[in-house]
């Protein structure tokens, strides 16, 4: 049957191999009396070209070769014509018992695809006689030669057979009966086999005890010829049918003796000889067989499976190899373990689709499974199976008792190999229902391991991939963050070991007309230029024209283009000093042109040095206190620097540091303008390999007093210490207190001081109005609205800058102005993102905004030429702050107005600074303001008050670090964390006094010292994080009204409890508003009202909530109202903001609560760290 596989070219010579259509064939064998009809249909069919339809039908009938010997003797093939769709009886083929087969598997290739044939045989009584499914994998290009088609076809996944009539009626019942019957027969058969083996052992049979290892040849490729059987010679069989009783006797030894003889055990396993392909091996290689069939079909199974073809046999007209009568008889009567044709036979594991209730495979199945693969075409597989079988035999020879689970036995040694196996007729009648192949297949309930040594996968469950839902202790969480957080330090450089390039500082040559001036003329000139004061006296003289400074022509052209006709006072004196190479301290009023005073000399300084290499750092460095000021410096200097081919870049916080690192690595930056904090970050990036200070020779500190006041003095000093000592350093500011001057001189080398118009002075172009108001927030807002109305009535396009002391006040004023119909309003303060701040400033400069509300962060560097009004809603706390605020208006010679509100009583101390500023600027002092200042002086004389004239004092970071360390220890105490990792330099907190017991019978201490410090209360949000998660079962609403007195009392109590809970906070697990029909079985609550805003956002934003919902399947609802600090809900108000988590099980609710708690903890700690690292924003601390 399997000796030939017809190729597409052999059947259809004109059919192209590249055809991609599917040509599946379904052939149905229908039994009617003694005739079987095969209905062969092609879909889509391929017409026969060059061949007759009768020849195709004969080939199909011959290859299918299906018939049950007892019923079917003739097969009729119906051919469907492709073009006319007519059915004709193409061929009738007779069959006999020897050629009939219950299970037929033969692939027929059709074009580029392969064929599928389903053959069904039915008896005259309507019962199922057998079902055969033949499937071949698709997608194989079939060669044009018949001999090559045999080795090209690929295996396909097995397909179950067609259902029989009874199975279609009740398939489940039929399967259960078959499984039960097979299991019972299998158990009985195993018992008999075990009894036989024990009987042989007792009789002293050496078959199982002898070790065959020594007789196994080393080369398994050479097959040993099995000796012929003496008692059973090969006899040619005729085609005459035999009685049923004779056939039964011939088949009993096949089913009952499933053994290996001694010669098979002693010789190596061999592969299939090349000359004779085996039918059952071919079928096993390409597809699996469904063995769920009736007993009548099973009896013919052994004969059909043993049928073989000869390689040297006759060739039919269609290339099919015919058999001789003798070979058919021999192959049909051979046993599975018989010596005849043992080398040609293939055994392979054939899985059965068993149910889960079948018994587990015993240890002996491992050997059976190994034996089932003997003789396959894969040499590597055969070698592995042979080694496995030999190892098993060696174990049997050493330990016979350990082989009780093996179901296969070895036959006696060579003395009995030639004897014919006896047939027990009585036993045959008893074992008629048990087939060894069926029993073997039933044992294969567990899939066997693959024969190849391939990498094995590992079973992974979804639960193994999930992180452990273990609550993280607060100590571990804070310890982890403390370990990650390191104090920013700039590495110290030993300049004595570094060899720096020499550079030139002095580029200034005094013009002849300036040299010829007398000392009196120079003094008069400095007096005309806003009273310039210089120290020492030997500094270069001031100039009056740009041409007298020795500038480049490109720079002169830019001055002409931007319209700067002559230098300002600070520029006239500072530029000659800077070009001469001396360090400089410049103090001038705001808007006087300090930026160009240090920027113009930088051009000559940079161009005089050699060009930059890719790895070189900048030559000039400008430090600014705020981001806005750094951007303004870059924008103002860029036209002049670009004209000379000099590149300037800006680096400040609020932007991704990765972008700025990439900018620096690209190189080519001559001047870098940066804030102190971001410059520290750049110095520490990649262990200091990002930014190099070797080429820096020109350093500028703009608004130096403000920079030191913000706590950057240690960082600034370390930055300056990392730069070569012979650098040129220039400091500029609008104010310069004496304490600040002492700190600045540490970083400068014999600096020259230039002071324009006094140390802290408001420009005379600015009109100052002081308004005294009572200490009422509403009255101050009324005054503000009154002044705004007057300003916009005079000029509707006017712009107003309002200063506040706190960020909260700025945001509140924004909402008040919105209500007053002022819509072109925005705010800037330290809590806003840098992008929002830049956008607001740009819109204000472009005139899109009429009102800008700001804290002191915008007082430095904000330059709006057309600003008409500066409004100090909160009074400045010291003189320097007042000067800087007022300096935002009246810039570049324009007129301006500054209005200041001061509260009386309450702000008498600030009146002293304002009176001093008015007197120094030559403005008139109001009488009521002078009275407030005099009253404060009287209080100072009486000792009830003292002066506070701190200005912008440099507090540094020592005090700030100490304050942060104190806050950290206080937080640890609140969280009840240990102090194991506490360092020695951390400040100690006063110990908390344990609360004393009180009540009847408890004596209270009368010692006055005992009433020491009060106990510090923990914040509410910390108590929530430390508390345990409580999950309650949801209370369902009652179906009816309470009838008994007890039920009415319980309902009233629950109502009262609900009302009380609405007044206060929501405790963890408190059941609130979750008694509806859609409420979960379990619920828990988490109050988030008192957490920081970032923490509340972390547990309420859609992204985080969606992740928790997907992971747990719970329902998360945000309920209640938000109440600010110090506010509590009333009796009829909703409770504080909280989260309600509902779920079907307690576990999922707990898991969701753990994740929410984690998000709250992370966001809260991040908010605390951000607040501590940012430091004070918009407020000034008064130091005594």
Swiss-Prot record:
Q motif, short sequence motif: residues: 544-572
Stored Pfam families: DEAD (PF00270), Helicase_C (PF00271), KH_12 (PF23469)
Molecular function in Gene Ontology: ATP binding; ATP hydrolysis activity; nucleic acid binding; RNA helicase activity
Highest taxon listed in the record's lineage: Eukaryota
Binding residue positions for ATP: 588-595
Motif interval(s): DEAD box: 702-705
Entry's Gene Ontology cellular component terms: nucleus
Catalysed reaction equations from the record: ATP + H2O = ADP + phosphate + H(+)
UniProt cross-references to PANTHER family, sorted A to Z: ATP-DEPENDENT RNA HELICASE DBP3 (PTHR47958)
Domain commentary: The Q motif is unique to and characteristic of the DEAD box family of RNA helicases and controls ATP binding and hydrolysis.
Name of the protein this chain belongs to: Pre-mRNA-processing ATP-dependent RNA helicase PRP5
Gene: PRP5
């Amino acid at each position: 049957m399997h000796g030939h596989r017809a190729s597409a070219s052999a059947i259809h010579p004109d059919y192209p191999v590249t055809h991609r259509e599917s040509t599946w064939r379904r052939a149905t064998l229908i039994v009617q009396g003694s005739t079987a009809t095969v209905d062969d249909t092609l879909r889509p069919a391929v017409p026969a070209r060059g061949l007759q339809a009768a020849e195709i039908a004969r080939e199909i009938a011959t290859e299918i070769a299906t018939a049950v010997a007892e019923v079917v003797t003739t097969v009729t093939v119906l051919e469907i014509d492709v073009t006319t769709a007519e059915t004709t009886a193409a061929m009738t083929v007779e069959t006999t018992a020897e050629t009939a087969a219950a299970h037929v598997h033969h692939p027929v290739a059709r074009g580029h695809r392969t064929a599928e044939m389903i053959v069904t045989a039915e008896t005259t009584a309507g019962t199922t006689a057998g079902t055969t499914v033949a499937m071949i994998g698709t997608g194989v290009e079939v060669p044009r030669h018949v001999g090559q088609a045999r080795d090209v076809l690929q295996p396909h996944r097995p397909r179950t057979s067609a259902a029989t009539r009874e199975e279609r009626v009740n398939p489940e019942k039929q399967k259960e009966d078959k499984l039960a019957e097979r299991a019972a027969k299998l158990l009985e058969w195993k018992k008999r086999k075990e009894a036989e083996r024990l009987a042989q052992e007792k009789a002293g049979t050496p078959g199982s005890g002898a070790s065959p290892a020594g007789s196994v040849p080393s080369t398994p490729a050479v097959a040993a010829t099995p000796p012929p059987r003496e008692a059973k010679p090969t006899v040619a069989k005729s085609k005459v049918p035999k009685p049923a009783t004779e056939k039964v006797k011939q088949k009993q030894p096949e089913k009952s003796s499933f053994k290996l003889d001694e010669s098979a055990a002693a010789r190596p396993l061999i592969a299939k000889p090349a000359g004779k392909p085996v039918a059952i091996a071919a079928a096993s290689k390409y597809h699996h067989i469904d063995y769920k069939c009736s007993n009548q079909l099973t009896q013919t199974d052994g004969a059909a499976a043993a049928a073989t073809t000869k390689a040297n046999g006759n060739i039919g007209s269609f290339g099919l190899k015919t058999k001789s009568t003798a070979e058919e008889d021999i192959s049909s009567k051979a046993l599975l373990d018989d010596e005849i044709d043992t080398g040609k036979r293939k055994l392979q594991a054939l899985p059965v689709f068993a149910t889960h209730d079948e018994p587990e495979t015993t240890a002996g199945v491992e050997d059976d499974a190994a034996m089932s693969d003997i003789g396959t075409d894969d040499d590597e597989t055969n070698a592995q199976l042979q080694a496995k079988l030999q190892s098993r035999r060696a174990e049997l020879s050493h330990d016979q008792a350990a082989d009780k689970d093996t179901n296969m036995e070895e036959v006696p040694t060579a003395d009995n190999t030639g004897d014919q196996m006896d047939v027990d007729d009585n036993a045959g009648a008893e074992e008629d229902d048990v087939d060894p192949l069926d029993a073997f297949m039933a044992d294969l309930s567990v899939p066997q391991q693959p024969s190849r040594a391939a990498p094995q996968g590992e079973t992974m469950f979804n639960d193994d991939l999930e992180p452990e839902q273990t609550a993280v202790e607060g100590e571990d969480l804070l310890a982890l963050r403390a370990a990650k957080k390191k104090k920013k330090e700039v590495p110290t450089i030993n300049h004595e070991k570094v060899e720096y390039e020499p550079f030139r500082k002095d580029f200034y040559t005094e013009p002849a007309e300036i040299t010829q001036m007398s000392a009196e003329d120079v003094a008069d000139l400095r007096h005309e230029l806003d009273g310039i004061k210089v120290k020492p006296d030997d500094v270069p003289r001031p100039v009056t024209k740009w041409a007298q400074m020795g500038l480049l022509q490109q720079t002169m052209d830019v001055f002409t283009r931007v319209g700067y006709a002559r230098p300002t006072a600070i520029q006239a004196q500072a530029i000659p000093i800077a070009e001469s190479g001396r360090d400089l301290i410049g103090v001038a009023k705001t808007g006087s042109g300090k930026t160009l005073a240090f920027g113009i000399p930088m051009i000559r300084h940079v161009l005089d040095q050699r060009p930059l290499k890719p790895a070189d750092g900048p030559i000039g460095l400008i430090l600014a206190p705020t981001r806005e000021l750094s951007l303004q410096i870059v924008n103002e200097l860029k036209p002049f620097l670009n004209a000379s081919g000099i590149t300037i870049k800006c680096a400040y916080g609020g932007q991704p540091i990765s972008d700025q690192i990439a900018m620096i690595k690209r190189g080519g930056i001559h001047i870098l303008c940066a804030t102190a904090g971001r410059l520290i970050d750049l110095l520490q990036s990649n262990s200091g390999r990002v930014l190099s200070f070797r080429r820096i020779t020109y350093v500028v500190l703009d608004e130096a007093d403000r920079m030191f006041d913000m706590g950057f003095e240690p960082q600034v000093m370390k930055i300056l210490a990392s730069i070569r000592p012979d650098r040129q350093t220039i400091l500029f500011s609008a104010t310069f207190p004496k304490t600040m001057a002492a700190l600045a001189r540490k970083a400068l080398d014999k600096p020259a001081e230039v002071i324009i118009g006094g140390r802290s002075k408001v420009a005379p172009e600015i009109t100052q109005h002081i308004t005294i108001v009572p200490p009422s927030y509403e009255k101050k807002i009324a005054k503000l609205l009154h002044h705004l109305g007057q300003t916009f009535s005079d000029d509707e396009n006017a712009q107003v800058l309002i200063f506040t002391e706190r960020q909260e006040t700025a945001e509140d004023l924004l909402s008040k102005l919105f209500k007053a119909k002022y819509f072109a309003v925005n705010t800037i303060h330290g809590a806003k993102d840098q992008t929002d701040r830049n956008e607001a400033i740009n819109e204000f400069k472009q005139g899109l905004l009429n009102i800008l509300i700001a804290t002191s962060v915008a007082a430095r560097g904000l330059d709006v030429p057309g600003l008409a009004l500066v409004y100090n809603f909160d009074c400045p706390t010291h003189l320097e702050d007042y000067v800087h605020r007022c300096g935002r208006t009246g810039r570049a010679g324009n007129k301006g107005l500054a209005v200041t509100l001061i509260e009386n009583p309450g702000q008498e101390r600030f009146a002293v600074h304002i009176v001093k500023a008015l007197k120094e600027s030559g403005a008139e002092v109001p009488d009521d303001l002078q009275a407030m200042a005099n009253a404060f002086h009287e209080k100072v004389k009486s000792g009830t008050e003292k002066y506070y004239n701190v200005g912008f004092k440099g507090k540094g970071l020592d005090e700030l670090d100490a304050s942060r360390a104190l806050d950290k220890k206080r937080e640890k105490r609140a969280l009840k964390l240990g102090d194991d990792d506490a360092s020695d330099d951390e400040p100690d907190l006063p110990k908390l006094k344990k609360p004393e017991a009180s009540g009847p019978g408890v004596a209270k201490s009368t010692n006055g010292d005992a009433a020491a410090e009060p106990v510090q209360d923990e914040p509410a949000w910390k108590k929530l994080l430390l508390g345990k998660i409580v999950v309650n079962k949801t209370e369902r609403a009652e179906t009816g009204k309470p009838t008994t007195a007890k039920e009415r009392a319980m309902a009233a109590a629950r109502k009262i409890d609900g009302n009380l809970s609405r007044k206060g906070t929501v405790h963890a697990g408190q059941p609130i508003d979750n008694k509806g029909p859609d409420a979960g079985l379990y619920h828990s609550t988490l109050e988030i009202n008192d957490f920081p805003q970032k923490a509340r956002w972390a547990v309420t934003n859609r992204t985080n909530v969606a992740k928790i919902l997907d992971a747990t399947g719970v329902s998360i609802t945000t309920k209640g109202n938000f109440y600010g600090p110090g506010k509590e809900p009333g009796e009829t108000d909703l409770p504080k903001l909280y989260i309600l988590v509902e779920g079907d099980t307690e576990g999922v609710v707990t898991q969701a609560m753990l994740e929410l708690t984690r998000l709250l903890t992370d966001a809260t700690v991040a908010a605390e760290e951000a607040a501590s690292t940012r430091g004070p924003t918009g407020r000034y601390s008064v130091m005594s």
